[in-house]
Amino acid sequence: MEAAVLRIKRKRGAEPADALLLSCKRLRTENEAQDSSVVITQVFRLATTVKSEKEPLHKYVQAAISCNQSCLALRPSLGSKQRIHEELRASKEAERQVSRYRIISSHRPNSEEDNVNVIGLSQLQDVPSDTKEEEKPTEATKCNISSNFQLFDMVQEEPEQEHLVKETEPETILCNSIRMIRERLTVSEAGRESEHRENMDEYVYDIYYSDAYKHGWIQDILYVQPYTEGQELVYEEHEPDEIYEDEDDENEENNWRNDYPDEEEDSDMEERYIGYYENGDEEEGQACKMYALLEFGDDNDDADLDRFKEDRFG
């Protein structure tokens, strides 16, 4: 089988899902036990949205498959255990939306039976069979059956609202202790009934496709739920860069490059002779400092010593 297609009927005002996750039971082989239940999942991606069910689907499906194959050629392989864990986690988050998609009918290409019996979801198994309505295939459905893909017609049901949320009164605005009057802009009836305005209650049809189903025909569907594209992202573990022992960081406080010469000797010498010129004038203090430098023979101040000798001794 080349592809399987889901045609979802929804209201124009509702948001379509980027992808759907379909879960079904795989046909057992002769070597497998009869009591063993093999459940498989398949991702269906959104190809396009059409306004009528009479639109031919073959061209949209083929174009979407070709585009998807081109994208896969440029994308690395995503088959990893971490991806499977992400899919399972997202499946649990989307369990509340399982009942939103109801399967109406299933059609196989080149089949003797134009319409396969209505397939219900797992939640509809308790409903008596006489309550399940069987729909006859339309002309558009018969036209699409001739294509090389299996077609499922579904309806996106809106969630039931048990408790309607009442609009609360807006906060009162005061100006100088006087209540302000709110004015609302009203839309004229002519604007509401304009031809270019779309009716949100009209129905459109979302076409989803899957080109990688390798287990024969899809049957015994358990559920259909939204699938998040972000689940395919594989988060690679961050590996720290290799650090060699002979490398060091210049910004570290204890790095040998940040060692500065000690100034304790100069500060001790100044503290030792500060008493000689603490209470005297600046000239006497400078002279005491120069005598101290002569005594200890500091080579760093040779220029100052020579100037001092010329001033004192000529």
UniProtKB/Swiss-Prot annotation:
Which cysteines pair up through disulfides? They are: none
The entry sums up its family as follows: Belongs to the IWR1/SLC7A6OS family.
Q: Which Pfam families match?
A: Iwr1
Q: Which GO terms describe its cellular component?
A: cytoplasm; nucleus
Composition bias type Acidic residues, residue spans: 243-253
| Region of interest (Disordered), residue spans | 243-269
Identify the domain of life.
Eukaryota
| Any one GO BP annotation for this protein | protein transport
Kindly provide the name given to this protein in its UniProt entry: Probable RNA polymerase II nuclear localization protein SLC7A6OS
What subcellular compartments does it reside in?
Cytoplasm; Nucleus
| Keyword Protein transport recorded | yes
- Please give the coiled-coil regions recorded for this protein: none
What gene does this protein come from? Answer: slc7a6os
Q: Which UniProt keywords apply?
A: Cytoplasm, Nucleus, Protein transport, Transport
Role this protein plays: Directs RNA polymerase II nuclear import.
